[in-house]
Structures are given as C-alpha cells and as structure tokens.
Amino acid sequence: MRPPDDQINNNVGSNSHLEKLKEAMDHQLQKSSKIVGSFTNSQNSSVGSVHSPILESPTSLNRQHRNSFSFNNVSSPSLEDERLINFPRVNPNRLMTSKRPNELFKTSSMSSDCYSPQKSRESLNSLCHSPAPSVSSCGNALNNDNTSASHSLTDEQPFETDSSANLFKQLQEKRNRTIGNVYEMACLLVFKTGLMNFWKNIIDFFAQQFFSTQISVVEPRDLSDIYNTPWQLRCYYDGGSHYDPYSNPISVNDNLASSSYVTVVASDGSKGIIYKDPASLKHEGDLLIDSKVVQTVLERATLLVYTRKQQHIVKNTKVHDNDYFSSIPNVDDIRSIKNSWKVFHDEKLNELKKQVEISASAAQLNGLYPQKKRAFVSHFSQNRKPYSQSDISKAQSSSFSEEPSNIYDEYEQNLLSPWSRSPVASPSIQTDPNRNPFFQNCLQESSFATESSTEKSASESVSETAVNDDCKGMNFSGNRRQEDHLNDFTSFPTETAVSIVHVPLMFPCSDQTSSRGRAPIAILSFKSNLVPYPENLIASIERLIPFIFSSYSNSQSVPLLPCPTQRHLLFNTSSTDNTKELSMSASSENSDCPHKEGECVGSFCNINAKGSSLNNIPKLPRFVPVPSEFFKKNQRSWVTLKKHRLLARLKSRISKKNSKVNENLRFSLNDGENYSNETITLKKDEIVLDKSKSYACCTSESHKYVQGHCGGQAPPFPLLKVIIDSIPVHVFTADPGSGKLTWVNRKTLLYCGLNMNEQIELQFSRIHPDDLPNFLNDWKSSLFSGSGFYHEIRLQRFDNVYRYFICRAVPLRDCTGSVLHFFGTMTDVHDQKLAERELQKQSAIAANENSYRSLAEASPQIVFAANGKNGIIYANAQWLSYSGLSLESSLGLGFLSAVYHADRKKCLLPESLEGTFNNQDESNGTKTFAAEIRFRSTDGHYRWHLVKSVCVNNSADTSTNLWLGTCTDIHDHKMLEEKLQESNIEAQRIVRSKMQYLSNMSHEIRTPLIGITGMVSFLLETQMSAEQLSYARIIQQSAKSLLTVINDILDLSKVRAGMMKLTSQRFSVRAMMEDANETLGTLAFSKGIELNYTVDIDVPDIVFGDNMRMRQVALNVIGNAIKFTNVGEVFTRCSVEKIDYSTNTVVLKWECIDTGQGFNRDDQLQMFKPFSQVESSTLPRHGGSGLGLVISKELVELHNGSMSCQSRRGVGTRFMWTATFTMDKTPLKFEPPDGCCPVCFCPYEKSKQSTEDYYCADDGNDKSATNFVKLAVNKADPGRESNRRKLESDKNVQSNKYVNPFASESEFCRCGASADPYTVLFWRLYRNKPSGIKLDKSALAVVVSHTKYSSEAIGNMLQSIIDISSFKDIVRYGNTYEAFEELLENPMQSKVTHIILNLPDIEAYVLFVKSLQLCSLYKDTKFILVTSTRQKESLSKIFSDSEDCNSESIHYVLKLVKPSKFFPLFYSDSEEKGKIGALNDMTRKAAMEQKADAETLRYNLAKSGFSVLLAEDNIINIKVISRYLERIGVKFKVTMDGLQCVEEWKREKPNFYSLILMDLQMPVMDGYQACNEIRKYELENDYPKVPIVALSANALPHVVLSCKDSGFDSYLAKPITLQHLSLIISGILNYTNQSKLHK
C-alpha cells in the first residue's frame, strides 16, 4: 500500500528548500538508473551461457513497462524483512521444516513497514517486465513510496490457500528466487553502513551464494605501513555456529558487552563476531590466513585461490537410523505438511518429497553443513534447543581459543579440467575403479534435457549457474552419487580438500595493470568445500570487490556500537505478532534519559515514530566511493553513494538546536531494487546551513587549533603526538647522560611488536648483533661529544626479520647550550639497500661481460652460458663451427637438436634433477655441474664431451642463476677408457673367482684336518706299539704339512682381497729374531749347516708393529734358504736403514744370506709369482706350495716396505726386505713382574710355541670349543689383545709401576723369548744395565769359527752384552787352521780371558783345547765351546776322562747361539757376580711367599662364605673356570645365559653373591643387557652394588669402554688364569673386610 500522492505534494510544497532537494534527487535518480543499466549489462559475462532475465540491464527491461519501475519494493532494515527479502534468501525447503508450519501462511507486521512474499514476487515480475521510468515518473514513484511508507500494515495477511496447486506454485516460485544476483549484492553492500551491517551482508552473501563455510577479515594495524606491521583479525565467521531464527531469541546479559567482540546474527541464523579490539591471527580457529599468505597477497595484489588438504582424525562411528531421519525431512514431516495444506494429491506430494531429499543431499554436497565437529549437521533437526549463555561461551571458547589442530598442505589451484563439464564424475578421482563413469545407472538426466523439457526461470542466480555448469564432477568431500550420500552416513574421509579464497580489498581502478601500485586495506578470506572453486563464482566475486571495498571503508567511519554513549548491547523483541524478531538497541550511558519508542537508535532510525527530532539523527560517516573510472562505458557514480551524499549535505544544513521548523517534512530516498524506505522527519526551523561542520571526528581542542593556527599559535600536545605517531619514521628520545631510550613513537612499537615498557626495557637489543657493537661505540662517542649521530643498522621486526635503517640523532639544547635530550629518527632504507646492492651487482656483471665474452671467443673449447629460465643464452664461435648451428637456433633449448637423445636428460640443471649432479664445493660453497654428453658434429657423428659449469650467482631464485661452462672433447679418451674398463672388469672377475675358489677349498680341507691333528695328538698320549706310534707320527706330520699349505693359500687370498689387517703392538726385534731362528734351528742343524743371526747395536730394542706377521716373513725367508742349502751356513742380519726422530719412525732392513746353489736371472723373475718354484735338472725336487715368498712380499708391502733378491748360481742367494715401525719413546727400565716375559712384559702362554702351532691358525672368525683351537685363534689374530696390552703398558710406563693381571704359570711368550732361568736373568740385568757387563780392561776375547758369518754373529752377540769401554778387544777368526797356527806359534801378549770355539767336528775341538791348555799363556783362559747336544755329550766324556785337560775351564754353549747363553759365563767374571746368589734367594723367597698367600686366601675365602655367580655358555670355559674356583675354595653357581643369571641373582638375598663373572656373548640375553638389568634393579630397590666382571675373548679398546658404560666393574680377557682370578677375588675380599672393620 502506498500513501496518497497529494499528501506528499502538500508537504513538499510548504518549503522551498525541500522543493530544491526534490529536484536534485530527481536528477540524481535519473542518472542512477542509467548507471545501473550499464552496470548490469556487464554482469551477463559472469554467468556463462545461461540467460536469465533478472541479469539483464534494468534499463532495457524497464523500457517495456515504464510505469512499473519504482523503488516501492525496498524494505526497511528490520531483521524480519531481511530474512524474507534481503539477499541472501532462505531456501524454502528449510522453511517447510520449521517448528511452526503456520508461519508459512502469514507475515509479520513491522514498526516501519512490512513485506509479504507474494508482493515480493509480484514486484519482481513487475520489475522484470516494466519499462524504465522517466525523470517525472521517478518523482511520482518517490511520492508514491512516501505514501506507501506512511501506511501501517499491522494485520497479518495470510496466503491464498484456495487450492493446493496455487500453494505449490507459490512455494516453487519462492524456491526459484532464493538466490539473488550480483546487482542485488552490490546494492545491498552500499545501502547500509556500519561494520555490523557489512559483516551481516558478507555472511549472507558468501555463506549461501558462494558456498563458504568459514569467513574472516584481517586488516593491518597500521595502514601507513602494511608491510612491516602485523595484521590482525577483525571479523570472523565459522559455519559451525548456527542460529535458528524461528526458535526463542537469545537473551544476552550486560556482561557480553564487556567482552572483546560483538556477535552479529545473519539472515539464516548463523552467527559471526566482530572484534572490538582486533585480535591476532592466531585467534582464528582453522587459520584461514597467516602472515606468510598475507605477504603473498600483498605482493600479488589479486584474488588468490588455494587448495588445502586437511588431515582429520575422525572415528568411524555408525550413525543410527534415527539420526538419519532426524536430520532430513521424514515421513511425519511430509504427513504434517499434507494435513496442513490438505490439498496436495499424491503426485505432488511425491514430487515435493523428492525435491526435499535432493535439496538435503545437495546441501550436504555443497558444504552448507559444518563438518568440523561431526560429519553431518542438518537444519531439519526437530529437537533443537534455543541457545543459552553457556552455549555462547562454549562456542566462543571453542572457536577462538583453540589452536589449529588439523595438519594440512596448501597449494594454489589450477584451472578446471575438461571433465568438469561432463555430466558424470571425473574418472581421475573415482573412488571405485570398477565403476564405469560413462555407463552408470544414475546419471543426471537434467543435463541432457532439451530446452523444451526444462527451462530456467528468470530468477536464477550466478551461483546457481556456477553449480550447474562448472561444479559437475568436482570434489564435494568425495565424488559419489546422491544415493550414496543419503544411504552411507558412516564414511568419514581422513583427508579433506577445501578451497581457500583470499580477496584483497583495494581501491578500484579501471586499469588492471595498475594494481601493483595499490595496497589493500583488508583481506577477506573464506573457505569452501568446492574443489576446485568455480571460475564464474570467482568472476562474480571480482566484480563485487569494489563494492565490498567501499562498504568496508565506509563502515570504518561508523562506530561499532550504534550510539556513541552506548555501554552494552541489548537484544530485545519488538513485534506485534507471534513471530519473534531480533532488534538491537543501545542503552544510553545516562540512565535518566532512556530511549523512547520510535526514537532513532544508532544508525537505524524509525522515521514513522512520533517525537522524532534532529537530535535523534546520528552523525553520518564520510563514505569512500568507488571512482567513476571503474566503469569504462558510463563514467557516472551509482545511486547508493549519491543517496549518502545527499544525506550528508542535508545534515550539514541542520543546525544544532537554535532554529525551529513549523512544518514537518517527510521525504524518502530510494536506491536499487528491493530496498527498504528510509524516511527522516525534520522540522522546518531546524534546517539551517552550517558549513563549518566537519565529517571527521575531531575534538574541541582540534577545532581550537584549527581556528587558532592562523594566528600563529603552536599546535597543542595531543595533535603533536598524533602527528609524530603518524609519520612513517621511527622517532625516539634518549637521555644525554646514559644514552638510554626514554620514549619512542607508536610506529616503533608497531614495528617491533612491543609495548612502551618492553621497548624501554630492551633498549637497543633489537639491533642486529653484528651491528650492535659499532653502533654502541658511535653512540657513546656522540653522547660524549654532544654532536650529531649517524649510523646504518639492521633492526629486528616483530616477525624476527631484520631490515636496514638509517639512525640519526641530534642533541636538543637549551639557551645556554646544554644538552637536554637527544632526538633521533630511524628511517627504513631496506628497499633502497637491496636496490643498491642489486645495482652494484648488475654493474659488476656488465663491467665484466665484455671481458668474459672476449675470453670465451678466444678459447679453443666450447664455452656457453645458461640459466634455468631461458636455457642457453650464449655460445661462442667454437660451438657454432662444431655443430653447424646458428646462434639463434642454439639459444634457449635449440641446442638439444645436436645432443644425443639418450643424453638430453643430462642437460638439466642441478636443481631440476633434485641434486643428481648438484655437487657442492666445500671450499667456497659454489654449485658445480659436470656431465659427459655426446654432441653431433657437422659430419653427423656424435663425439663425447666433458661438460663442466659453475653457478656464478647462487641466489634463492634458481631460475635466475647464471651458469658458465665449457665443453671439452674427450671422445678418444672415452673410447680407450671403455676398453680398459671392460678388460679390468673381466680380469677382476677371474681373479675374484679364483680367490673365492681357493678360499673355499682351503677352508673345507682345513676344517677336517684340525680334527685329525687333534685326535692324533690325543692318540699319541695313549699306550701304543712301536709300529702304531710310527704310523701315528706319519699321520700327524702329513696333516700338519697339508694344513700349512692350506693356511698359506688362505693368507694369500686374504691379502689379495684386502682383508688382511695389521695390528700394532710392542715387541723386541732381537727376541723375534731369536724365536724365528730357534724355531728353524732343528731343521738346519739336522742338515749340518750353520744358522746364525745378528742384530746391530743401533737397532731399537722395542718397536711397535705386527710382530706375528714379521715373524711369518722371517720364517718363510729363512726356512726357504735352509731348504735350498745343503752345505755351509744361513745367516740373517738386521740393521737400521733409515731413522726419523721427528716422526719417531724407523725403517729396519733384513738380509738373509745362504751358501746354496743359487739361481739365474730368469729364475729370479718367477720368484715372487704364486705357485712357482725354481726348477733345475741339477737340483732335487723340494716340497712346498710356492706361496711363502709371495705372501712374505705382500706382508712386507703392508708394512710400507719392499722385498728383493740377488743370486749367483753356485755361490749363494741374498734376500733383502724392509719394513717401517714406530719406536718406543720410553725404554723399559723397571723389572718385569713375575710370570711375565722380560722382553715385552706380556704374560707367558701355556705351552711352548712351534712352527706347526702357528700354521694351525684360523682366520680369527671361528670359535671352537677346545682350548687348543682357541689358542690357535688367538695366535692367528694377535690384534685381539695387542691394543689393550699397548694401552696398559703405556699407562704403566708413565707411572713406572706395573701390575699385570694376566700373569700366568706358563713358560712361553708371544715375542719368542724363552722362560729359562738364564734368559730371564739376562733380560732383567740387561734392562737395568743397558751399557753392558764391565770386565777387566786388559781382557781379550778370541772367537774361532769354521764359517765366515758365524764368527761375525758370535762377536756381535758378545758386543751386545759386554761394555766395550771396559774391554780391550774381540779377535775373530773365520779359518780354523789360520787361527790354530797364530794362537800357538805367535801367542798374544795381552791377557786372553775367553776363547770361543765353533768347530766342525769333535776331533777339532779336542785338538784345539788340549793344545792351547798346554800353553802357559792360556792357563787361566776360559774355553767356551759352541756345540750341538750330541757333541756336548761326547766332548764332556772325553775331557773328563783326559788327565791332560782342565775340564773346569771348559764350558759349553748349545746351538743356536744367543746372547742370553753367553751372558751367565761373562757375568760370573764381573764385579757384580755376587748378585746372582742374592737373585736366586729372592726368587725362592718370592715363591714361598706366593704359596703362603695362596693358602691364606683359600682359608679366608672358606671362612667368609665368598660366593660367585658364573654366567657362561661355553662348556669348556665352564670346566676351566670351575676348576680354578674349586682350587681356591670358592662356592659358585653356573648359569647358561644372561636371563638365568639375572633371575638367579634376584632370587637370592642382596648380599648373597660376592662376585658375578659374566660372559659378554650369550644366548637369550647377552652380558650387556644382563648387567644393565641388574644395575637398574639395584637402583630401584636400593640394593648394594655387587661387583660384576666381564669375560670376553675380544680385548679391543672399544669393547673395554662398552663394558664400562654398561656398568661392569672390571674386564677379564680369555683365557682366564688362576692367578688373575685370585687377584680379583682377593681384592674384593680385602675391600669387604676393610668395610666391615670401618663400620
């Protein structure tokens, strides 16, 4: 209904001002209609090919029906009208499931005006079919609207329910127009002002039209610097918080107003919030946008669409059928609708049911229901309860207090694939691979319908077109049919893909390329379940951006609360019907002046109310219009902005309260379609002109300043503070005395993200640490001198990013010149700094480009330059001449035509190949690229080239990195290399196969031989006949010989395979030589040849090296010499070839000389080849494998040495080899302990070592169950204990006190030194007396031998034991006849004290001794005869029976000759001969004391109840250790693994076991784990710590450290000795007794 036209005419005619105003409004409305028509014409492109009359130009539509185009359909801004009229509209399917069905048949009356859905449809039809109005018709329309506005529609107007067909038609028409168009959106955005209205409209638009489930608006804290200040959350909406507009209204108390946000209720009941004080981005629930995305939006300055894949942890719970029927319209709902209307026949009812089900399914697919808390939440639920205050609190806390819990990946979306247009789902994302997408039972038949069958109505919207046209086949949280969504409610995806859209709100501009120069004032972000997001929806949003920007900018000028004096919000219900309506009013701060009904409250005024005056009109904000340049065709503004400008002009003419108006004026402003009438009632005398009124919110002090500034007055302090805080420079003041900051402006605080107190406390700590020292020094100097300050620094931003600033400061002085304060500024010059660096870099590149180009052209190689973006950017003339390509065809990727097709992948830069060729140079950190590529030459052949390039500017953007490289022709070298590689591979295969075969053969043959030799040794201990004993010895000798050959083969295979590893241990060179010669002495003396050796005086006595391997070399070489020598002698000499004291190394040289038959030069070439021997017809066939010398040479080379030989046939052979060793810095000058070798101070072994024992050695990997094999293993791999011994020896050398826990009762050492009494005595005194034995200075010794090298060897040994300075001389004779004649015919005048004779037979000895004893000069001479055992027996009998000989002066030395054998003979003649008896007494006394200690220990152990727990899995070891424990009287218990040991220990009392002996390698639980369990149990139960000793055959240092870390108290290496066990047990017993005495 509209009021009569004459009513408005009378009112207007009474005032001339209003007539002018009406004319101006008519003029503006005429312009507006044209602008709207031009604007809506541009909307047709955004909806694709679908034609809808509502999207046509209003101008073209209105030409058909001019009289019907008016603004009488615009409703007032009441919440109820917005629910029914304003965009977005509620789906009628949702209205049908309301709790009160009778609401469908009535409409509520509003205080201002009302609206009926039927009239809305009529007005819509009239709009679509009415011509455009003229200027006069617009005026009439204005009058008619005013008349209509004055009419009160307070009665309920029910729908026409004459027939069910009409009702169904009405519902169908209402459903068709539930979605508006872009035109409606734009008009609604600019129609209402205020942030609450803005946010309500945004929620309505994006939640229902753009399928948004979550929306947020962020804005910068400082608009003057949006890049360097953090952004904050202003508005937020979560689709999970729903509000039912038909339920009871929300009752909010006053406490809600004191919160930090305001709740806004949208048309569909959804709630959004607006922060009064904008919050941090972390407050956002699902974090739609963060600081990194903000920076990306600022850089791109355009709308961005991302795809986010979220990982959800959702329990797969079965939804009950009742839940399903409660979430969608059930049969009862449909029956209630049928009973209410009573006119629907069965066919219509089924059709309605189908539409409702499809609507529910589509709503679920489109993401209208929230999926954050549960899978499906429906608006059709019938048992919904109204919200309470606690619900609001929970929703607020859950939405804004929790941290984002979902893990997601985010990337920018691509364009839609062609499958998105298909009527069926895309096969690329089918969940069921067996389903054929082209032959399905349920297709969307509507997609194939003709135009005659289905026609689109005139009210279809942009979003509806998008869903039908572009969203087919999209991922709506799973690509399934509608039946699947309705029937399967229990399938919850673990990964959900959503679309995130970021819309920057920027000042609109007609030129799209100028967006880089604009900055957004806010960023609107929303989330949608449409993946990918439709393009036409994006186009619609882009057209709405200017209106969203204008609305948001205008809303910033309006206070968030409706009234400036408002303290809190009240949600009241003011309605004249039964329908509840939410209205927001503001309560005044003054309780004495409450708002009356009809007064203007906030930005909403009830113009029809009585008593309205100018005082009730709020201050109108200034608006930011969209410039006319945005519209390219029509350069005009739109209606909405013109309306607000008119209101602003009108308000500027209203005086405060002075003038009176006699006549009420009523006017109406209408803008757009379907808008409410807004009427303002004024009094005539209150309309005056007041141009001094400003739109900005200024204080009275500001007005005073504006008025007084012209008179020269200074601006007030508040204005100065505002100015300082607004300038884009950091301002600070500092104390001139201390230099500390006293104040900073707001710009500084925003940049650093701190408050004033924090900034004052931190001072200059935000400066980069590298710049801070220089800054403080210059700052102190400036403070001291009172001069200006200038420094360039890097200042830390709120997000920990450093930016360059120029800091300037000047002193502020008073009239006397004293410095009161320092005033400083910091100017951001980061961009200038980066630009300066880039300019310098480009200048340097440009300066060197010509030089590089000249050098490249002069190079004979191919030179090129490339980058990742453009490919090849330069190639020199050499490439052009080689390939025949032109420069233009080679640039970019054109060079690939000359690259072999298989090598083209190699041309990718390193970053493209994920680091395949990306080699980082460690020296300078540059990236290099190298590849071998085949290029085609001009003759068509491909040649190999080595391509090398280097990255000269390694930047973060890899596409701009410059690579310079060269190509070198390596074709000939490549061909040769391939041939050599093929030959080498084949040779290695053959050698590897042979070595593998030999290794397998040796292992398979040697294993049974070990059993044969072991059993034969046991057999020899039994009673056998002479013939059986002979057979057994032959078997033993043959088995040992065969085992020697097999071991040699294995050693050779290990050396060739690189598996031979040397050990470093202390050993004596002299002792090693003695051992090797003594081992082979029996073989040499049985053949009647002499065997001797010498070690020079300057050879270090102790060196570090692999003793066993060097002994093996000596045995092989000396044994080979003995084998090929039948007459004469074999002599070995050791000397120093080179010594280096700086590195503490020495190179020793060995020479082995024999008097055999020798060999020629041809045989010398075959000497060091495997399985080769010297063959000659004159030589007999000798046994052997032919591997001894080969293995010896390999071992010598492992010691950094060499081996060679020289020979002359018929004369003899000389073998030479060298090896490098480390010298022992600290000589052993202390006496060795009992039971240890006096040479190397290592414990003795159990039995005397022989050559055969060594060759029984294994490779160190097998662990047999017998002591014999275990001993062989240790001998084969002596490195197991060498490192430990070396460490212990080093420690004892430093402390000069040695305690050897490994001392044993055996009589043999690894170093080869014998344990006979004379040897021990020699080495003991030799260590204490390294200078030698002192004799009479007139003494003279004579050596007579029948061979050349034997006399030299005996003389050398005498020199090693006698002090040369106290001895006159040693005379040597190598010829017995010459010596006999000279000694008898020409006797020596000096005193001859010793004559050493080494003669070939017994007769020579008898002749020499008897003849010399008859001479008076040799009366007191001592004769030393070097003989064999048989010769000694015969000579002893002859001299004892002879009366002419003095047998007491005759002494015997058995071969092999050693210094230790001569030592007792010379020592008894020295001045210290009395010490021998004392030494023997000390030895006997020590033995007696040791025996007494053993008895005492046995008695104490039996008395104390000492008990031992043994954990060992080897039966032989258990027997040995048990025997030891029984001998010393210790109680013990045996367990077979670690688990049994732990359980046995826990079973007894804490102190029951005094010691635990635990093996490291055991089944079930090893020693390490068992020890850890025991130590852990002791700590948990506060048990005393029990001693645990580890037992292992591996004594390497890392094993000892591992035992210590695991909790072991000590470590024992196998084999375990009785003495060692006694020492450990006695130490524990003594400690226990002392503890008891102490307590």
Curated annotation (Swiss-Prot):
Predominant location category: cytoplasm
Residue span(s) of domain Response regulatory: 1507-1629
Amino acid composition bias (Low complexity), ranges on this chain: 67-76
All residue ranges annotated as the PAS domain in the record: 716-786, 848-920
Region annotated Disordered, chain positions: 38-76
One of the GO biological process terms: phosphorelay signal transduction system
Enzyme Commission number, as recorded: 2.7.13.3
Modified residues annotated as 4-aspartylphosphate in this record: 1559
Keywords annotated in UniProt: ATP-binding, Cytoplasm, Kinase, Nucleotide-binding, Phosphoprotein, Repeat, Transferase, Two-component regulatory system
GO cellular component, one term: cytosol
EC category name: transferase
Residue positions, PTM Phosphohistidine: 1003
A Pfam family assignment: HATPase_c
Ranges of biased composition (kind: Polar residues): 38-49
Molecular function terms, GO-annotated: ATP binding; phosphorelay sensor kinase activity
PAC domain: residues covered: 789-841, 929-982
Domain named Histidine kinase: residues: 1000-1223
SUPFAM superfamilies for this protein: ATPase domain of HSP90 chaperone/DNA topoisomerase II/histidine kinase (SSF55874), CheY-like (SSF52172), Homodimeric domain of signal transducing histidine kinase (SSF47384), PYP-like sensor domain (PAS domain) (SSF55785)
Described purpose of this protein according to its UniProt entry: Involved in the control of the SAPK-dependent transcriptional response to peroxide stress. Also has a role in G2/M regulation.
Name assigned to this protein: Peroxide stress-activated histidine kinase mak1
Native source species: Schizosaccharomyces pombe (strain 972 / ATCC 24843)
High-level lineage: Eukaryota, Fungi, Dikarya, Ascomycota, Taphrinomycotina
